[in-house]
Amino acid sequence: GVLVRDIPSIIKKHYTGPAAVMSIPDYGARNYTLMRLALQHRDVTLWATANPSTILELLRVMNENLEEMLHDIETGGISENFDIPFEIRAELDQYISPKPERAAELRKILEETGHMYPKDFWPWLQYLSTWKCGNTKIYMDKYMDQFDWDKTFYQELGYIATECRFGFSLDDTNESVLFPQFHYYEFVEESELDSPRKHFLQIDELELGKRYCAYVTTYSGLFR
């Protein structure tokens, strides 16, 4: 929510919904609203979230409430069966309108394929980004057949946390390149991590082939 709130307006207008969605207290209502706002658009080209389990959860909520969601898209509403604060519903009004043609298209997809996969309801999806390392593969394997990988590039989201984004992946590997121009980094050799007197190194002191732990100071002064 903070990311969507703070991005430049020229980018923000391309999002399917406002940051206020992330302030919906009820988890199920929040996920329903996220997918309801996104599914009304055929031309979604990018889908990004940190944990791939979120992809599965959003698809589950969509499928379990599909007819209700299609009715919402058709009529331009958001179901009253979900607990969404009045002020957030009011803000969402500018993002929704009746789209009977889109609802009909989605029903036709369901009738012809027997399922609702992203490769069918978002045919122009070009980019998917989540974490891809560690045990995230457990979740990834459950939706890999739902995307058209000839059209959609799947990239590691990169080195990111609540406090800041540390780096970005430049290819289809799980490696991240640090953003040295955005934060201040210090490094400690792996062998010194448990030492009470750590030797902190600057980025120009690192040696190729060695392993380090990164300590980050953000623009706001947060040290981690």
Each model region followed by its residue ranges:
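Active-site glycine/GP-rich loop and adjacent strand/helix microenvironment
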Residues: 1-224
